Structure formats: C-alpha cells, structure tokens
Amino acid sequence: MNKENSSKLWKIIQEAGDYLVGQLPNHPNHPKGRNPYAHVAICVKSKFNASYKDIPDEQYDEVVKYIEFLKENPS
C-alpha cells in the first residue's frame, strides 16, 4: 500500500479503536481489559493475510468497509 493510503488507514484504525474502547467483551486472557486498537489491527491482518501496510492499494475500500463492520460488531 502506498504511504498516503497507509497513513489514512492507520488513522481509520485508530478512530475505530477509540470507538471500541469499553465495548469489546471481556476475555479471561485479558483481565485488565482488551486493547481495541490491537483488536482492529489483528482482525485486519487475519482477514487480509497481511499487515495493513502490506495490503494492496486496490483493496483499500474493502479494508475500510471491514473496519466499519468491526465497529458495528464488536467481538
């Protein structure tokens, strides 16, 4: 992904993390609470099999839609 899209995507990931603070369900592996920023980044990496920086530019819109899905469906 080019630097401009990568920067935009990182900002969207941060905003999604801000939105999800306190919304993720409790988990026994995270007794002090879950990190919503890491959650979004890990979900993106898992779905697209690459770090957000390494996803092709052609998939930018798809990644943004997926992040919106994560915000609407905290898990």
What annotation goes with each model-predicted range?
Residues M1-S75:
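Positively charged, phosphate-engaging catalytic surfaces used for nucleic-acid and nucleotide handling
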